[in-house]
Amino acid sequence: MTNFPKTVMLLGSGELGKEVAIAAQRLGCHVIACDRYADAPAMQVADQAEVLTMTDPNALKTVVNKHQPDVLIPEIEALAVDALQALEDTGICVIPTARATAVTMNRDRIRNLAAGELGLRTARFAYASDAQELQRAAAPLGWPVVVKPVMSSSGKGQSVVHSAAELDKAWEIAMAGARGSSAQVIVEEFLDFDLEITLLTIRQHDGTTLFCPPIGHQQANGDYQCSWQPASISPSQLQQAQTMARTVTDNLGGAGLFGVEFFLCGDEVVFSELSPRPHDTGLVTLISQNLSEFDLHLRAVLGLPIPSITAADAAASRVILAESQGHHVQFSGVEQALTEPDTNLLLFGKREARPGRRMGVALARGTQINEALAKADRCAAAVKVQVMD
């Protein structure tokens, strides 16, 4: 991809897509942002926007044929993956590949690949297609267990279950949070882990693999709350994580940045999940690295050099959540939030708030992780999300 500008089409236009769009435009690309609703965050900065049902194969093919993009960059899971494969077969470049998008959109396919085909260490797991089957599948794993829809995003539909009496409720939660048409869950043993990390893994067109320093993160109900970089892990743990990340991304192929999640349990590293795109926990790289995860994604996608990846001594992020439902979103406390040095805010531009919805993120650097986390916490706490109706 030596000639510029390029036309980039984003399939999904949330806050991560918005940063991808900005990174693409800095490289002179023409960006078309697509989503199922108008005025999504990435649409606010894109050159053009399209509203469509992206699980509709005909609608997806129509919009791609209309714009003839050089690259298609999926930013969400809920896509017509058969249409993506058909488009790739005609010569359209799907990032990282149509197969990678299909495999990672459902937890069962990526888990079967990782644990079954590739032999990566994972939590023990089983699948269930109804509440009765869930009862049978959960008991052999021991209590507690974690129940998740095979297809969801941002932790939706997840719950930790401590006894058989709670499984029917867990099934209801999973079905309410599921995306797509699949009525299936994955049930996993609950790991008594020390830390969750994301290893941002960059795969270039020639097969070269690069890694960012590991990112530690904390979640609530499966949804990211804060992250920090670098995570303190041993050389052995880092080697295990890098080996597993390289193994699975080489199998998926293509070029781009992958967010590979692991649990650290004592000296062991356990594969958790993988996203073939920038990761929400990686928002910290907007303040921590010389090239953010979004810059790295675009460089890999477009075949551009990545001479080095350097990171600050310590950096952290903390999400800013809405507490109420409504439109006409406004923010107060921004001035107070930005009084400390080496801090920044991203306010995503979402037009609708609802309790627990991620509306922004606070970023901070420090000399140590605890200092950076405390600064990010103060920055985020100062910002209040208000709705006018």
From Swiss-Prot:
EC number: 6.3.1.21
Class of the enzyme per the UniProt entry, highest EC level: ligase
Binding-site positions, ATP: R107, K148, S153, S154, G155, K156, G157, Q158, E188, E189, F190, L191, E196
Lineage: superkingdom: Bacteria
Function: Involved in the de novo purine biosynthesis. Catalyzes the transfer of formate to 5-phospho-ribosyl-glycinamide (GAR), producing 5-phospho-ribosyl-N-formylglycinamide (FGAR). Formate is provided by PurU via hydrolysis of 10-formyl-tetrahydrofolate.
Family from the record: Belongs to the PurK/PurT family.
Protein's name in the database: Formate-dependent phosphoribosylglycinamide formyltransferase
